[in-house]
């Protein structure tokens, strides 16, 4: 077990691990925790009731946070022709086709979101082994395979977050920064839970959202009483 920092241990003393906190209480606790040397992300960790081994019970999509994530999202667009200028005008950080594919094949992945026009997907397929494990492979379900590259670029820059369950059926994603004021964090958190609650796969049975924990990047988790928000 890794040795915890003094700051982490001090933060953990503030949290009653037997209690489920209201959203307001949880955000107040987050604000009371000792700060790291950088502006930590605030992350949601959601345990779901899906069976992740079944292909018809995968959670994949996007949510939009009213106040964004606070992160400068680097967006890459695979496209050609007139769409190149559309993507650049919308604020994409990297735009192109063959040259980007070659860079990625050499190991470069210095971006957060990859968007592609449908005509590029056959060529991008060869990047699956590199982009797939990193959650960067463009997908129609995630809204990252589209002809409207300008809208997609703007949306991800503004705070759209891609959602995908891990191998254990859990979801992990940022909802803001610790520097956000409490009201903005609350609005992002509530909005995220409301949107996630509508993403239950049709084949999934029983409760969808089983447990919700909110935590700073370098701090302990705080269990939320999420029932009033999602049920």
Swiss-Prot record:
UniProt GO cellular component terms: large ribosomal subunit
Disulphide bridges, residue numbers: none
Coiled-coil region: none
GO-annotated molecular function: rRNA binding; structural constituent of ribosome; tRNA binding
Keywords associated with the record: Repressor, Ribonucleoprotein, Ribosomal protein, RNA-binding, rRNA-binding, Translation regulation, tRNA-binding
An example Gene Ontology biological process: translation
Gene3D superfamilies associated with the record: 3.30.190.20, 3.40.50.790
InterPro entries assigned to the protein according to its UniProt record, in alphabetical order: Ribosom_uL1_bac-type, Ribosomal_uL1, Ribosomal_uL1-like, Ribosomal_uL1/biogenesis, Ribosomal_uL1_3-a/b-sand, Ribosomal_uL1_CS
CDD domains: Ribosomal_L1
Pfam families (alphabetical): Ribosomal_L1 (PF00687)
HAMAP family reported for this sequence: Ribosomal_uL1_B (MF_01318_B)
Function: Binds directly to 23S rRNA. The L1 stalk is quite mobile in the ribosome, and is involved in E site tRNA release.
Family: Belongs to the universal ribosomal protein uL1 family.
Assembly mode: Part of the 50S ribosomal subunit.
Protein name, as recorded: Large ribosomal subunit protein uL1
Species, as recorded: Kosmotoga olearia (strain ATCC BAA-1733 / DSM 21960 / TBF 19.5.1)
Record gene name: rplA
């Amino acid at each position: 077990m890794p040795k915890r920092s003094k700051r982490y241990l001090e933060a953990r003393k503030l949290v009653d691990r037997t209690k489920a906190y209201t959203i307001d209480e949880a955000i107040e606790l987050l604000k009371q925790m000792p700060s790291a040397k950088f502006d930590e992300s605030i992350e949601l960790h959601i345990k779901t009731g899906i069976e992740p081994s079944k292909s018809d019970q995968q959670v994949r999509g996007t949510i939009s946070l009213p106040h964004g994530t606070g992160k400068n999202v680097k967006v890459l667009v695979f496209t050609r022709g007139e769409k190149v200028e559309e993507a650049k005008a919308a604020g994409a950080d990297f735009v192109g086709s063959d040259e980007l594919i070659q860079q990625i094949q050499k190991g470069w992945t210095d971006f957060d979101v990859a968007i592609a026009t449908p005509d590029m997907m056959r060529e991008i397929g060869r990047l699956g082994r590199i982009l797939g494990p990193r959650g960067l492979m463009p997908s129609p379900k995630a809204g990252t395979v589209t002809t409207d590259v300008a809208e997609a670029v703007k949306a991800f820059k503004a705070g759209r977050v891609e959602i995908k369950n891990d191998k254990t059926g859990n979801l992990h994603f940022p909802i803001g920064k610790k520097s956000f004021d409490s009201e903005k964090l609350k609005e992002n958190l509530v909005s995220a839970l409301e949107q996630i609650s509508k993403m239950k796969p049709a084949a999934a049975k029983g409760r969808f959202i089983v447990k919700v924990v909110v935590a700073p990047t370098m701090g302990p988790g705080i269990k939320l009483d999420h029932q009033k928000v999602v049920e």
